[in-house]
Amino acid sequence: MQDLLNQILDEVRPLIGQGQVANYIPALADVPANQLGIAVYGNDGQVFSAGDADTPFSVQSISKVFSLVQAIGHSGEAIWERLGHEPSGQPFNSLVQLEFERGRPRNPFINAGALVICDINQSRFAAPALSMRDFVRRLSGNLQVMVDGRVAESEYQHRARNAAMAYLMQSFGNFHNDVEAVLRSYFSHCALRMSCVDLARAFCFLANDGFCKHSGEQILTRRQTQQVNSIMATSGLYDEAGNFAYRVGLPGKSGVGGGIVAVVPGQFTVCVWSPELNSAGNSLVGMAALELLSQRIGWSVF
């Protein structure tokens, strides 16, 4: 495995320069584009990594999985009364579909759906941002995981479209807490800084029927784990989920910080990071690396 990871990074590194770092979030635009890391975490606890796998980066939308898992943990099936689990086929920050469907988001991984999940968690936790940080620390086994305050503030200052979604949902009765407070929590989640190794460890319960071996916790039931993985497979990579299924064939979740996490049910979790994005907002080099890894080991679930 170690030799394979090294080989794959060597093969995809020439692709650096063909994408573009996220520039609509000023604090992310400064990230050096030539960084590249990958980590694989096995259900037996073995970790393999290569490149910049220990370098923390902004997880961005990858955090939506953690928020969803929190909400399922305390509210179960009730959360689906407020949002769906269908692919959207629209950009992740679209207002058009949200208006047409009367404020009920298609799934928890588009921005509107993630905001509803944060609203649900806001009603449950006295300090949602701290609760999320501590939850992710337990899952990753890294007590040094922190929120990048500069990134969170940068995103809050550019919150107009997310605020519009929240207020639109509020007008349909599908948003219950103070919009600005929920936005603060949401951006705090997105601004978590984690490495490839951190994220591969943190997602390991999704490859192990909901059980996190290193923390000894049953995070989700087996059925809930299957449900989360299925939504990742259909909606985890914005409007490029079909292409990811075709090329990689695994449940996955990406973020505009350049990270992609993928789950090999029953076996492994993988995280790859390269800051340059393709036109769909997913890591260009990361997609290529995961495609090679999945093909060469035969990991596709299809």
Curated annotation (Swiss-Prot):
GO molecular function, one term: glutaminase activity
Pfam families: Glutaminase (PF04960)
Keywords: Hydrolase
Protein EC: 3.5.1.2
Top-tier EC class: hydrolase
Catalysed transformations (reactions): L-glutamine + H2O = L-glutamate + NH4(+)
GO BP annotations, alphabetical order: glutamate biosynthetic process; glutamine catabolic process
Binding site for substrate: S61, N111, E155, N162, Y186, Y238, V256
Subunit (UniProt): Homotetramer.
Listed NCBIfam families: Gln_ase, PRK00971.1-1, PRK00971.1-2
Family: Belongs to the glutaminase family.
PANTHER family attached to this UniProt entry: GLUTAMINASE (PTHR12544:SF29)
Protein known as: Glutaminase
Organism: Pseudomonas fluorescens (strain ATCC BAA-477 / NRRL B-23932 / Pf-5)
